[in-house]
UniProtKB/Swiss-Prot annotation:
Superkingdom classification of source: Archaea
InterPro entries associated with the record: Class_I_gatase-like (IPR029062), GATASE (IPR017926), GMP_synth_GATase (IPR004739), GMP_synthase_A (IPR023686)
Protein name: GMP synthase [glutamine-hydrolyzing] subunit A
GO MF, one annotated term: GMP synthase (glutamine-hydrolyzing) activity
Keywords: ATP-binding, Glutamine amidotransferase, GMP biosynthesis, Ligase, Nucleotide-binding, Purine biosynthesis
Membrane-spanning intervals of the chain: none
PROSITE patterns hit by this protein: GATASE_TYPE_1
Length: 183
């Protein structure tokens, strides 16, 4: 069994990330608060959930030093970029949106299977505008230039959209692909 730990950054959809992973075959999943000490983290992979603000991310920056694959969703995606030398800024489009995302790297282990494009649900005010060294932009849209990014050498991935919500057409595939990375 692959054990995934969902780190709660107090986002509105965190429970959906947990539920989606819980319902997958071959996966055990736990939900933990972002104040859990890094030394207490024991998992095959981490999902850094979305959340309202970078001011309340607990130990998430420290989790990036753990030797496990990590998937950042929305705020989690942004904090990976911010901590590792990328840049985030206020986006031109804030709020909720049904967005068509173009997959720019069909070989990417996280989002490549969604190529050439997919419809997703976005809910964010800030966005990644420059990826850290070692990362590749793997998806983009008309409203956000870095919808997804990945560093396959370090198994660090991020998506700006919310794959856990029903409005995202192939969201479950993102989590299935992440579990495969963690195996």
């Amino acid at each position: 069994m692959t054990h995934i730990l969902v780190v709660d950054n107090h986002g509105q959809f965190t429970h959906l990330e947990h539920r989606l992973l819980r319902d997958m075959d071959g996966v055990t999943v736990d939900l933990t608060d972002n104040t859990t000490p890094p030394a207490d983290i024991d998992a095959d992979g981490l999902v850094l959930s979305g959340g309202p603000t970078m001011a309340d991310i607990g130990h998430c920056r420290e989790y990036l030093t753990l030797d496990v694959p990590i998937l950042g969703v929305c705020l989690g995606h942004q904090l990976i970029a911010d901590e590792l030398g990328g840049r985030i800024e206020a986006g031109d489009y804030g709020g909720y949106a049904d967005v068509t995302v173009s997959i720019s790297d069909a070989d990417d282990p996280l989002v490549g299977s969604l190529a050439p494009d997919t419809r997703v649900w976005a809910s964010h005010a800030d966005e990644v505008v420059a990826v850290p060294d070692g990362f590749t932009i793997t998806a983009e849209s008309d409203i956000c230039g870095v919808e997804a990014m990945g560093d396959t050498d370090r198994d660090l991935y991020g998506v700006q959209w919310h794959p856990e919500v029903a409005h995202t057409e192939e969201g479950e595939a993102v989590f299935e692909n992440f579990v495969a990375i963690c195996e």
